[in-house]
């Protein structure tokens, strides 16, 4: 009898296990709703990093007063993504989240940036370039397994990472280049049609993300606030590879970055749950940062009277207003050309001419965008093709100085430079007009497994072309032109696949025998000469260094920096080490090695690239010597000092 009584008092072992599991599960569960951020505090309710901050009821990710800004915000408690990482590392758990965001640029035609929802095992992801790539990633397009996964809401098009357009949603697996992406829009729940919309007009946008761990699937839906959640997701990604980019516990949050262009990015509300159904966001009273809807207490009759009165008023003054408007437009056009502009290179296009050529700067004509601005393809009335680059300057003085240099460069004439045809100014926006290069940029033919790899003879020719163009800039014109941003993406290919050096937005001019008056470091990581890190002024030698990196890129088929989980690969150091070991031809692209009957020319160019990248700028060849060597003239003195032993010493000096 007593045994039976005790049995009734104690639960079974199975029940105890279930209770413990339930308690553990409950203690780690996350289920929250922020319909406003007015009362949140840093580190307690959310983790605010860098420039992210609470502004009234919303979280602002970016500081518009800082030209290079980034911000992140995370929920302080980590999500459990892999419940049992030791015994079953590929069994993932699930969660759902929904949030409302707003993206509003200062200038509608400026480059866009966007924001990301992110899962990361760290609030400071390693190797992230803070002011670019959403403040999360590097500029490498080679993926490596690490716990970082993002859903990007991208409002800029970067052709270097194969963005599909400047208004899309994508899945990023520890890489700025999306694994999959789709134009922003939603599927109508009634007729099933796909409705596109603009994420970059300041209007509130609602996003829903379902992370289905057991099925390795991510569903993303996005729609303007006011649209019910679509039945069909905007984007679905299903692949077991997801398991490679998550860890046992991960922070959930948002990240964004910017360069010189202002684009406010705000999180207005956020809900997340890993226990089941989401708590619903109330979007009724959320702030609106563009075209605010104003409520009215006026009666229908009063509103009708106001409308009728307005119609009568417009009818009375319409014709006169039209005449005044036409007069003001003519005066504005006349005032648009200021006296100081007449000093400069005179080929000035009208805005109407460029608008017609680009279909009013249509997204369908967009070639690319970046920190410099947007580039559009255009067709003039004479059927000639052009590329129009839109650049914004905040001050008239800065615009005038920029115009002075651009006008000088407009007089540059060489077959291996992208020819500038003219310009147009509209207020503080400058539009530069160039010849259109139909075959894109060199990097598109070298990296990322292009459909038609560039054969060796064309690679060799492009190196020659760029060398001759750069030699002209350094030695062949009235002034010395320092390009300062030589890289494979700034080398464009014409209809005959001949290389032309383009993008002179960072270039500086000075007299022969003089020196540039700037020490500001600009350019692209991986191409910058080491002496620039010590505030040295850019010179012909720093351009030669960048050219040497391009030579090594073209011959090896590898990027200047390839980021990896354990150690980054710096191209110059890698080739120098191979040369120091007597194996420099091993650096050549496999496609090149299989094509060439002899490796002598390949070895010569690799050695030339190393000579151009010498750590000591005084020991680098100049462009005259380089062109002479490439054209076949004996220049043994350029390379005689470049022995394997010397390469090893250079490598030591470079890392000192």
Swiss-Prot record:
EC number annotated for this UniProt entry: 2.7.11.1
Ranges for region Legume-lectin like: 30-273
Signal peptide: 1-29
Enzyme class, UniProt record, top EC level: transferase
Keywords on record: ATP-binding, Cell membrane, Glycoprotein, Kinase, Lectin, Membrane, Nucleotide-binding, Plant defense, Receptor, Serine/threonine-protein kinase, Signal, Transferase, Transmembrane, Transmembrane helix
Any one GO CC term of the record: plasma membrane
Record: residues binding ATP: 367-375, 389
Active site: 485
Extracellular-facing ranges: 30-304
Key word Glycoprotein present: yes
Keyword Transmembrane helix: yes
Domain of life: Eukaryota
Record's bilayer topology term: Single-pass type I membrane protein
Catalytic reaction equation(s): L-seryl-[protein] + ATP = O-phospho-L-seryl-[protein] + ADP + H(+); L-threonyl-[protein] + ATP = O-phospho-L-threonyl-[protein] + ADP + H(+)
Localization of this protein: Cell membrane
Major localisation: membrane
Residues modified by glycosylation: 42, 63, 121, 139, 191, 219, 282, 293
Membrane spanning residue stretches: 305-325
InterPro entries noted in UniProt: ConA-like_dom_sf (IPR013320), Kinase-like_dom_sf (IPR011009), L-type_Lectin-RKs (IPR050528), Lectin_legB_Mn/Ca_BS (IPR019825), Legume_lectin_dom (IPR001220), Prot_kinase_dom (IPR000719), Protein_kinase_ATP_BS (IPR017441), Ser/Thr_kinase_AS (IPR008271)
BP-aspect Gene Ontology terms: defense response to bacterium; defense response to oomycetes
Matching Pfam families: Lectin_legB (PF00139), Pkinase (PF00069)
Knocked-out gene: effects: Increased susceptibility to the oomycetes Phytophthora brassicae and Phytophthora capsici and to the bacteria Pseudomonas syringae, characterized by stronger necrotic symptoms and higher bacterial proliferation.
Family classification: In the C-terminal section; belongs to the protein kinase superfamily. Ser/Thr protein kinase family.
Stated name of the protein: L-type lectin-domain containing receptor kinase S.1
Organism: Arabidopsis thaliana
Lineage: Eukaryota, Viridiplantae, Streptophyta, Embryophyta, Tracheophyta
